[in-house]
Amino acid sequence: LGFMACVENMTRKIPGRLVGKTTDKKGKTGYVLTLQAREQHIRREKASSNVCSNQALCALAVSVYLSAMGKEGFRNVAVQCMSKAHYMAEKLGEIGFRLEYDKEFFHEFVTVSDISSEKILTKLEENNILGGLPLDEKRILWCCTELNSKEDIDEVINILKEVK
């Protein structure tokens, strides 16, 4: 699943289904497929939307989630993800991990350590924590989301302080 933004006059050229927000006769908010001429069931030969049922189910689930969160909720989740990832990167740096890339990042980042990735992740697993993704012997890809609390991150850091 992905999100794409474009200027209004390009909406007929981008791939995928477009969902629009509308209001019904009773003033209730509703979401509908817009520009249906792009859809397979209207103009198969020129369709820019090619979605199968399992993708549509994922899109429906995300639509419900995003609708429930609203505009500010979606932004708040993004801010939480970013701030928690930067917090974790900073804390990992304090205990000897180095950032692989000196670039901006959102909620995923790669660290390098003198301790083996396997040893680090095994120690976390022993504490019922699913750590990052090992990229090789010394590098790990970490990810933080809105579901990770600062207490969770601090617990990971405290456990990693014990790894030698």
Task: Give residue spans per PLM region.
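C-terminal alpha-helix
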Residues: 159-163
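Conserved C-terminal alpha-helix-loop-beta "cap" of PLP-dependent enzymes
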Residues: 72-155
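Active-site C-terminal subdomain of aminotransferase-like
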Residues: 1-95, 99-102
